[in-house]
UniProtKB/Swiss-Prot annotation:
Pfam families recorded: ParE_toxin
Record's subunit section: Probably forms a homodimer in solution, interacts with ParD, possibly as a ParD(2)-ParE(2) heterotetramer, which neutralizes the toxic activity of ParE. The heterotetramer binds DNA, but not ParE alone.
Knockout mutant characteristics: Loss of this gene blocks plasmid stabilizing ability.
Residues forming coiled coils: none
Misc. comment: Plasmid IncP-alpha RK2 is maintained at 5-8 copies per chromosome.
Swiss-Prot/TrEMBL GO biological process terms: plasmid partitioning; protein heterotetramerization
Keywords from the UniProt entry: Plasmid, Plasmid partition, Toxin-antitoxin system
Name the record gives this protein: Toxin ParE
Amino acid sequence: MTAYILTAEAEADLRGIIRYTRREWGAAQVRRYIAKLEQGIARLAAGEGPFKDMSELFPALRMARCEHHYVFCLPRAGEPALVVAILHERMDLMTRLADRLKG
């Protein structure tokens, strides 16, 4: 699988998912859910599995649904893919994503 790194914001997204899942459903569910998310992120970074090309919004941007979250990733030649956001399906995805891509 292709390597990837998380931006600080995506890392904060992941920490929030872990906290919420642990609080609501316990440690065992955290392990299961995060394992599925990590597999989905790795597939997206490698360009495998179903994903949506979001290049019209931002050059090379990819999006894939992983469980109840959407992952946004920028592949980079010769470097690990950059995960810019991991957002819950009920969030205003485009508004939150636009804020991330400005910087």
